[in-house]
Curated annotation (Swiss-Prot):
SUPFAM superfamilies per the UniProt record, alphabetical: ArfGap/RecO-like zinc finger (SSF57863), Nucleic acid-binding proteins (SSF50249)
Protein name per the record: DNA repair protein RecO
Pfam families membership: RecO_C, RecO_N
InterPro entries: ARFGAP/RecO, DNA_rep/recomb_RecO_N, NA-bd_OB-fold, RecO, RecO_C
Keyword annotations from UniProtKB, A to Z: DNA damage, DNA recombination, DNA repair
Entry similarity comment: Belongs to the RecO family.
Keyword match rRNA-binding: no
Annotated GO biological process: DNA recombination; double-strand break repair
GO cellular component: bacterial nucleoid
Length: 234
């Protein structure tokens, strides 16, 4: 890839580089995660734009792993997230950085990310966060089977299951591994628009299950955003 023009993108992470440049990790709609250097950030007026939670249109050039940004334009209003919403936003960025490779497109995840950021600022974001996590796992090759159990039988909403990423769902009481959830929770996660994910106890069960699945794919990596959640609770 020699470069790209006018790509919708979000900043996942940024840090200062040399005297007047910035290194950024971008999540682009068409190309996935992109590492880039932004030269002359202050001179070009990019300082206030290369921030998380601001929709951008960017162009870059370069064939290697680290591109050079050539244009940066704000593509919509930014989101001033606070408290738990900010921690959720950082969480999404962290799992994207951990579970994706550069220049590996994740178009559905990109769409779910954009929706989730908007929900963090305006609404109950938990259903949008779950849909983001599911899309990320699916497009990263870790998709979950949520509508059939390990024996190929349809998941029953009223039944209890233990769910493990390696095996899937098995009736509770037949094994000790995995997270115990209701069939209703699994079916709510499987629903295209996540119907029912705002209601308890489905809401808390879905959160607990997805946390366990994501953590398994992170290996031993610790997320700083989880420390933010704990500090907010304290």
């Amino acid at each position: 890839m020699n470069g790209a023009q006018g790509q919708p993108a979000w900043v996942l992470h940024r840090r200062a580089f040399r005297e007047s440049s910035t290194l950024v990790e971008l999540f682009s709609q068409e190309y996935g995660r992109i590492g880039a250097v932004a030269n002359g950030v202050r001179r070009r007026g990019w300082s206030g734009q290369l921030e998380p939670f601001i929709p951008l249109q960017v162009s870059w050039r370069g064939r290697g792993d680290l591109k050079t940004l050539t244009t940066v334009d704000q593509a919509g209003r930014g989101y001033a997230l606070r408290g738990g919403a900010l921690a959720c936003g950082f969480y999404m960025a962290e799992v994207l950085l951990a579970l994706t490779r550069r220049e590996d497109p994740h178009p559905r995840t990109w769409e779910r990310y954009a929706v989730a950021v908007d929900c963090l600022a305006t609404d109950d974001a938990e259903p949008a966060l779950r849909r983001f996590e599911l899309a990320l796992l699916e497009e990263s090759g870790y998709g979950l089977e949520l509508e059939q159990d390990v024996h190929g039988e349809p998941v029953v909403a009223q039944a209890r299951y233990r769910y493990s990423p390696e095996r899937g769902a098995d009736r509770a009481g037949t094994g000790e591994c995995g997270v115990e959830v209701s069939g209703a929770t699994l079916l709510a996660l499987a629903a295209t628009e996540g119907q029912g994910l705002s209601e308890e106890p489905v809401r808390s069960e879905a959160r607990r299950l997805m946390r366990a699945v994501i953590q398994q794919h992170l290996g031993g990596r610790r997320l700083r955003s989880r420390e933010m959640f704990r500090s907010l609770r304290d």
